[in-house]
Amino acid sequence: MQRAFPLLLFALAFSSLPAQEYTLTPDSQPQDGVPKGTVTKFVLPPGKYYPGTPHKCAVYVPAQYDATKPTPFMIFLDGSQALGNAMRVPVVFDNLIAKHDLPPMIAIFIDPGILPAVLDADQNRYNRIYEYDSLTPRFAEFLLNELIPEVEKSYNLSKNPDDRGLSGVSTGAVGAFMAAWNRPDQFHRVLSFIGTYVSMKGADALPALVRKTEPKPIRIFMQDGKQDHIVAAEPYGTNFSGSWPINNQVMYEALEFAGYDVKFEMGTGGHDLKQGGADLPDALRWLWRGYPEPIMVHEPAGTGQPGYDAADRVFSTIYVDKPWRQIGGAYGPIFSLTSDAEGNVYFADSRTNAIYRADADGNVTRFSEPPSDIPILRVGTDNRLYAYRPWKDEIVSSNIAADMGSDEKTVAHGLGDVVDFVVMRDGTIYSVNGQSGPRGGIIRIDPSGETHSALRWSDLGAESIMARNLALSPDQSMLIVSDANSHYSWSFQIAADRSLVNGEPFYRLEVPEATVRGFALGAAEDTNGQVYFATPLGIQIAMQNGRIMQILNPPLPGGGPLTAITFAGTANANWIYVAQDGKLFRRHVKVTGANAWTVVKPPKPTL
């Protein structure tokens, strides 16, 4: 109740002000002596992403276009509207390019798709909400793989993401923002007019996601009006999905919190383009200011100031100037990563059946060539490398100083389709199979090699669990089980007799919009008891209390899910390694990873 009163006052303030009169400036009027660009219309035929659905498009080309040079460009959603009198984009571009306020750039206009009805008596299917309101990467992939290549047939478009911008109005603002959010390797500039960041199809959740997620190199201009879906009798909003002014404000605050280069113009108008059209020239100047300087990620403006709360924020884990770096080459799918006390990382290449080692300096060399595929590796406290052999259904160990196969010992066999295992300091091993249903569960292997059924999913009434990874807490008192089948992962207490007890679906992960599954394919812990889950959204970092507090971006935007994760280092385990699309990446971090040979009691969690 304490927050409701201020928000009500906020809403009442919106409804009590008369709408300001907005007029187009000379920058939106044709000017004598200014070179005029050309606009060519075309229809993009149906393709893979929106089957059977054509899109009406147009391309503006400035008079200064030079076909020998890669040209910056912007894509305007609801393209016919952007071409119309409310925005007059070609006129604005002509004037700003002539003033050198914009570089010579192409504008691509695209309308939302309409699936034609089969019969005249039938209704068309209108795709605007499906395309623009979606949080999935589908629309971004459509732009990158269908629209842009079509325009590139005629024009030399830049591939530099700093040269690429997006603009959207209302629901189109969500589409523009999400295309850049999902593919920050492709788009760095966004115009958002009267954005629909409300509960239509999930955009109301974006501010929370923005606050948690490592910032991306995107510059955003936002505009809304205090009477956007607001009337005097309903200052809290007239639409079922929420309040446009409040949600735009919350979105802006989230972007500021995360450290984005963002500007927000809150006017007095409604859900229209009166202010947006008048603001467009200055918005474009702001969006492209400093060009061609690259758009970079920065820490939030309040960093280091008195009262600044740095705990639990992304930059308490990572360095702003130390991004992911690929090491080694291209391999087959990498299903596990493990490290030793010297900071070396080991992984198996499923394509060549070879085991590779990355040293502390990031140099990757072939370590050994076992006779067949070994997907899972773990380093134990006895300086031995443990491996699972699926063709024999056994775990073996070898001296880490020798090739796999020499000095080899069989640890256990008959384990049943193992997808991961962990080795404790006392030599106890927990292995998990990839089966769901009554056959799915965890096996405990004593140091003597004797095996025991430690847990069956059916014992928990959770037969849908599809475990993919195990991790130990830094004090080795808890076993974390990542579940690829839901957005929860489990925490089990390790009893004195090494049985697993008191299991709970403790960690609630964020999931990709296109699925209800979390697809957590890896997990690791730091010495503070925080869990790092490898997921399609990136590395989701859970506080010791179970909350997801940070999400680190994956190395390859638009790539496949992260398939493995580990910490490594020398004096401290201060590197984090992940595998994605058969490639190995690492980055320097501010935290220290937990390992099998050093047992550390984590601090009491925040409650």
Where are these regions (language model features)?
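Non-catalytic cap/lid and distal C-terminal segments of serine-dependent acyl enzymes
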Residues: 20-302
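Short loop/turn segments immediately following beta-strands, especially the blade-tip
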Residues: 399-403, 491-500, 588-597
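Beta-rich, blade/repeat-based domains predominating
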Residues: 329-344, 370-389, 413-441, 459-478, ...
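Beta-propeller domains
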Residues: 344-369
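Beta-propeller fold detector
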Residues: 325-328, 365-370, 406-413, 452-459, ...
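Blade-level signature of beta-propeller repeat domains, shared across WD40, Kelch, NHL, RCC1
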Residues: 563-607
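Blade/loop signatures of beta-propeller domains
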Residues: 301-323, 500
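Short loop/turn segments immediately following the C-termini of beta-strands
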Residues: 350, 390, 434-436, 484, ...
